[in-house]
């Protein structure tokens, strides 16, 4: 063969092989991925600020494909809303010219009397406000069942929708039952009590209803009735708004911004009644924005807790809801709050928890010069965007796997505990503390559909109904601590299980089985401040309880968060690794389940700003052993398993 022909042929073969490897490592499915910038009213009202923002978008193109304008939040004046809507319409067109889609967010009931700057213009004169269980009345947070208030919402939302024709209108996370300061919960006003009595054929006053909710002694489930009634109150607000929007802007979809209220049991288990009302009125599938605080990264591990909070919210959504825009919040939007790198790490972590989109509240207050926001935040996010989008596309159709920190759907009807304060049953911190084990590589999947097993603390055990407890402990793998075991004994649940000798290789644990194949492991505590030998022992105990089905085990000593993604068959699809320590993390050994040599899989390590690295595993039966390369302090990457 002629030398030149040989070289040409060889280059062609290498190029083909390279393309095949690239295709194999990055092959994805369609996704709903978007990066979104959230705004406040000044961004459309102030023409100078608007111009600066438009220029920032030109400087860093293809970073955000959508913005959420914000309706006025400090007034009930329709004249003020009309002026604002006119300015928003102009701004919407200007952003469309940059191929950036305008959407809109607006408040509903009000976060609290002082949250929206305590404006006197927010105090209603034509309808009543929220009254809580103790008779505390808000000044500026609105009762959701007041006809004139609903008429106001109908007119206001229709005004903005007609002028701007937004892609989505988002109802703010003040559409909630609890925390409308100074009111602890809604709504015990005369209107709501009267309608509740009419619906259920009762004659409660506020005082007698509160007493019955506290004891929950009747057979008709007053707590459940009141929660359902409260959820219907919120859904009624969403229905009125959705109907008015659809009338003037039929292509506009609705969205709900919600926060993590699985701790606030009066909220109910999910927000699906609101989403259902939105879809019924518009005929369009709504969108979700889960969130829950974490306003600065001064204590960066809090992003992990927020991530797991959002994972639980996401799993409770109707499966038809695919647009899930995680809240990345920088309130008060100071340079001293969130770091650019922190925003990027947070972004991938929330995608790993199940979000499909990212919404950034990082410029809202305009407290810093727009040029600073752009050159600091926009620039870094633009650099990370391909990395984030690839993850979202690759992992579409999968969800986090591992341990489900289980909370009963019926936790709210648990019995009152001795010495418990009034209305102590309306909140729970079940399983919060044990999530700190995630910093040591324990994979969690709150409310996961494909969880390997369950993990519960004493409070979670207290919230189980008898039938539920019987079913779970007879059929599932469960990890609990001694405090939870004491609750089980007190409730007679220990009789469901038979003790067995501690399996070889495990220490400091009591093990039990059931006649139906359940496994229960009881450990002293969920303390995360432990030496590595105890960490590995605890992981092995957890794996035994899961019948050796944990999708991934971090075998190296590291302070790292491990998030496996599994498909509908429970097959491992990817693993995200977050170094949640200050120090550089040396090679990290991961044991990947169900990835035996016969699968002929490839393992590609991905990190922002660096070339992909194909890793070569060792095999032990159906397990692949992978060494993840060095990972810097507070950095994140992910392993694609093809």
PLM features per residue range, with description:
Residues 25-57, 63:
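Boundary/entry segment of secreted carbohydrate-active catalytic domains
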Residues 60, 65, 71, 113-115, ...:
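Hydrophobic targeting/anchoring helices
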Residues 101-164, 181, 192, 196, ...:
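Active-site-adjacent "subsite" loops/lids of carbohydrate-active enzymes
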Residues 141-176, 234, 244, 383, ...:
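An active-site-proximal structural segment forming one wall of the substrate-binding cleft
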Residues 425-429, 434-440, 444-449, 455-642:
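A conserved amphipathic helix/loop scaffold
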